[in-house]
Regions:
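Hydrophobic alpha-helical transmembrane segments of membrane proteins
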Residues: 650-777
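Segments of small-molecule ligand-sensing domains
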Residues: 345-354, 367-431
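Non-transmembrane, solvent-exposed beta-strand/loop segments in proteins
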Residues: 444-487, 491-674, 678-679, 701-708, ...
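An alpha-beta-alpha
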Residues: 73, 175-238, 262
């Protein structure tokens, strides 16, 4: 039985000094671990911010490269001038977003020549005095020719995608043309009118300027009469004081001519508009043809103020033919993507000027990348010369640039090579590909010319042969999409396919290039008839199609379902499939609503958009033909591609797949409130959460096919793994502090861990919300 100590009597042990563990030399352990933890957090934050800042500094520390553009932003050519500027700016913006050229951002100086010669010459001196390394523009020959000598004397590289004056490049070795010459365009137009359209008489109405109207008229007349046709020429005065008088004379002459033939307008669109209105209002309905200046939908829209046009769309322009370097309904996917981007950026449909000056900017940037530049005021002349040399070296497809519509390069005279001349026809206010095109035969030795000419498939103009290329207006109307199989990378589609064309019996001989199984027989259309001179075929097609799914953004992903076909018998020179914009009613806003109906069976996906593109399939095999052994053979077959963009419904997916992970985030965070006296329990909960999340990640990956990259959702799991690991390391550090009785340091460390945890989670959520802000539907 123990005896209680008497009051006032000290126990012997209380007199002994309390023994503490020996203190370590240096900084107290608790403070050391706390500082180490803070230092680790700072290193992570500073490393992230520093890396981002360095990358930004590297892209902005170098002086910007300066380019200039001279275009018409006011005056009669303001519309195409604005288009050209927007096309250039669109490409330069994309280059700057990607880091610029060799670390240099690109600045664009914009000069408005107002479609006025005197202003253009002043602009030329301003451009030369600026730090611009090269210039894009001018828009047309009437402005370019008078200022050409100024640019030549300054050795300033100039790239134009629209100036056609024949002599401008020969008079200036620093001028580079990405387009056709006046002679090429007018001569080809004459051949088309005579050989394809079958006209034997032509009335040439031209503006009396020496830079464009007169040489265009002369070239057309020379070729047309050389083929055996007859012409009459009628001049329209550019001088406003004389213009109405000459216009009245033109109308009077044509009104009293019973056989005016085709009326060829050798002039820019502003003058062509005046002539067309005068002719149509006086009842002259003869077919007309023009150069490329009026060749766009915007030209038809420019008549909207007239009552005749409002009551009957296309009243003035229906039946008008025009040449063009680019027709969007027969353009490849790259051009269609550009058109979509342009419309999203500027809210309007682009004409050919926008696309061609986008390509001019591509060539300019390629020259900047290859040139050796010091980019100082003292080196400006040498830098300009270096860029000119790089442009001059682009004399082959390999040395050139891959543009929107094919390779971009120059001949030795600095003229663009292989620039196509297409012909369009206005119909109900739209500029569409004409039913027959002319395609030059690049290697006549590989073609049985006599046989093909006898069959009416080719025509001869001098020493040049041309294929008569049939245009097939094609469209796909989606009826239903079902069974998107992620594992097999396929989807099932049910749709209608139609074609409208002249002549060619082989137009419907197609194969679906990405079909795994399809029910289609070209010999059994649902409907077969001839309408307005065009053969019309309608097919009902069902099948399974292969897809190339991209899961980098999973589950915030957008996928593209592609249905494409190609002709299996005729090459692309003989037949081309174009987008039937009228049949597809692409201009109507109800098109998207109709397309959404096809996806009603897909509960996990939402329809976003549909894009059509004329496509080309290339075969580089010689097929054992000895004539092809020593050639760079490339046989191309035309086709059409329909690309449907769909988007995963993110919110339902996140609710069903991430709810468990969210609970684990909360569980680990809740464990931080466990008393530091029970750090072992905290470790157990964290390890359990870590292992559970690993199992969840395996379940997510099992839903995807075998892919060799990390998807977006996986990064959330990886971040959670890192947080768990951080919590475990800190818990062990805090346990060590407890051993030394550093309670204050433990509390501070725990508070900091709370802050870091919440900060990481908040930053991750914000980042995903910002990056995928348009995907949460």
């Amino acid at each position: 039985m123990s005896q209680e100590p008497e009051p006032g009597v000290l126990h012997a042990q209380s007199l002994l000094p309390r023994v503490h563990p020996p203190a370590r030399r240096g900084r107290p352990p608790g403070r050391r671990y706390l500082l180490l933890f803070i230092l680790l957090a700072l290193v992570l934050v500073v490393g992230f911010v520093g890396t981002y800042s360095v990358s930004k500094l590297q892209s902005t520390s170098k002086a910007a490269y300066t380019l200039a553009i001279s275009t018409s932003l006011s005056g009669s050519q303001a519309a195409p001038g604005q288009e050209a500027l927007q096309g250039v700016q669109l490409y330069l913006d994309s280059v700057n977003r990607a880091g610029g050229v060799n670390g240099h951002t690109l600045d664009l100086l914009v000069f408005n020549d107002k479609d006025d010669v005197a202003t253009a010459q002043k602009v030329a001196h301003q451009v030369i005095a600026s730090p611009a390394l090269l210039m894009l523009g001018p828009l047309y020959s009437g402005i370019a020719v008078p200022s050409n000598q100024i640019y030549r004397n300054a050795h300033l590289p100039v790239i134009s995608a629209s100036v056609s004056n024949d002599a401008i490049t020969s008079n200036n070795p620093f001028f580079f043309r990405l387009g056709t010459t006046t002679t090429q365009e007018a001569s080809t137009s004459a051949t088309y009118a005579f050989q394809i359209l079958g006209f034997r008489n032509a009335s040439i109405v031209y503006t009396d300027d020496a830079t464009y109207g007169m040489p265009t008229a002369q070239s057309f007349a020379s070729t047309f009469t050389g083929d055996g046709g007859t012409v009459q020429t009628l001049a329209l005065a550019q001088n406003p004081a004389q213009r109405q008088k000459t216009l009245d004379a033109i109308v009077n002459t044509l009104a009293h001519n019973p056989k005016p033939g085709i009326i060829f307008l050798a002039m820019l669109d502003t003058y062509a508009r005046q002539v067309i209105v005068a002719l149509r209002q006086h009842g002259i309905i003869a077919p007309m043809m023009s150069t490329d200046s009026p060749g766009s939908d915007s030209f038809a829209a420019s008549f909207s103020s007239y009552p005749e046009e409002r009551s009957q769309p296309g009243y003035f322009t229906d039946g008008l033919y025009a040449s063009s370097p680019l027709l969007y309904d027969s353009a490849p996917a790259a051009v269609q993507n550009f058109s979509t981007l342009y419309q999203q950026t500027y809210g309007k449909v682009p004409g050919w000027h926008a696309a061609k000056y986008y390509e001019a900017a591509q060539v300019a940037v390629a020259a900047l990348q290859a040139a050796t530049l010091k980019n100082t005021s003292a080196s400006l002349s040498d830098d300009r010369m270096s860029i000119a040399e790089q442009l001059g070296s682009m004399t082959s497809p390999q040395a050139g640039v891959v543009g929107l519509d094919g390779p971009l390069y120059f001949d030795n005279a600095h003229n663009g090579v292989a620039i196509p001349i297409r012909f369009g026809q206005f119909s109900h206010g739209q500029f569409l590909s004409a039913p027959i095109q002319m395609v030059s035969i690049s290697n006549p030795a590989l073609v049985n010319l006599a046989s093909e000419e006898h069959a009416g498939n080719i025509i001869q103009v001098g020493k040049q042969y041309y294929w008569k290329q049939s245009v097939v207006y094609a469209g796909i109307d989606l009826k239903e999409v079902s069974n998107i199989n992620v594992t097999d990378s396929t989807f099932t589609a049910d749709f209608y396919l139609w074609m409208r064309y002249i002549g060619s019996a082989n137009a419907t001989n197609i194969s679906f290039t990405n079909a795994s199984s399809v029910m289609f027989d070209p010999s059994t259309p649902v409907t077969s008839q001839t309408i307005n001179g065009l053969q019309y075929r309608l097919y009902h097609v069902t099948g399974d199609f292969k897809a190339d799914y991209d899961y980098h953004d999973y589950p915030f992903d957008q996928q593209q379902l592609i249905i494409s076909f190609q002709n299996t018998l005729l090459t692309g020179d003989q037949l081309v499939y174009v987008i039937d914009t009228q049949g597809l009613q692409l201009e109507q806003h109800t098109t998207m609503d109709d397309a959404k109906v096809a996806f009603q069976l897909l509960s996990s996906w939402t329809y976003r958009s549909t894009q059509y593109a004329s496509d080309t399939f290339t075969n580089r095999s010689t097929l054992g033909n000895p004539l092809l052994f020593n050639t760079q053979v490339r046989t191309e077959y035309s086709g059409l591609e329909m690309t449907i963009t769909i988007q995963r419904k993110v919110i339902p997916y996140l609710i069903s797949h991430l709810l468990a992970l969210v609970l684990l985030f909360l569980l680990v965070y809740a464990s931080l409130f466990i008393s530091t006296k029970h750090l072992g329990d905290r470790l157990v909960l964290t390890v359990t959460a870590l292992l559970t999340s690993a199992v969840l990640l395996l379940a997510v990956n099992s839903e995807l096919p075998a892919i060799g990259y990390v998807v977006s959702l996986s990064y959330i799991y990886y971040i959670f793994f890192a947080i768990c690991l951080l919590c475990m390391i800190v818990a062990l550090m805090m346990e060590k502090m407890e051993e030394y009785g550093k309670d204050t340091a433990v509390r501070r460390t725990n508070i900091i861990l709370h802050i870091i945890y919440l900060t990481i989670v908040t930053v991750v959520v914000i980042c995903y919300m910002v990056i995928y802000s348009n995907r949460f539907i």
